């Protein structure tokens, strides 16, 4: 049994991209892009596992994004339990302006 179990009620796929500059009304020319598993409990379990302790992340997952979330968590080698849901797992988007 795991010593730490996290429960994430609203997990997400965290999408991060970088742009040279953000200008009102202008298209963003994105460079690179990264997708990571996200949500409070998922992140806590990832850190605990990286520090060498035993943890398992429990979270709902649905739709295409839910399947991707499960793949991303598995890619890191972490233990997890995905609870199937009818809805779609959310995706959030962060833009880093390199110029600032």
Regions found by a protein language model. Name each.
Residues 1-58, 67:
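Glycine-rich phosphate/adenosyl-contacting loop at the front of the ribokinase-like
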Residues 50-100:
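Conserved N-terminal subdomain of the carbohydrate kinase-like
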């Amino acid at each position: 049994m795991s010593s730490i179990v996290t429960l994430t009620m609203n997990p997400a796929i965290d999408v991060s991209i970088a742009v040279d500059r953000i200008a009102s009304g202008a298209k963003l020319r994105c460079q690179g892009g990264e997708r990571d598993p996200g949500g409070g409990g998922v992140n806590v379990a990832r850190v605990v596992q990286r520090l060498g302790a035993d943890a398992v992340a429990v979270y709902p997952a649905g739709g295409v994004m839910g399947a991707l979330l499960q793949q991303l968590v598995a890619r890191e080698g972490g233990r997890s339990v995905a609870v199937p849901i009818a809805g779609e797992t959310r995706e959030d988007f962060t833009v880093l302006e390199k110029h600032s």
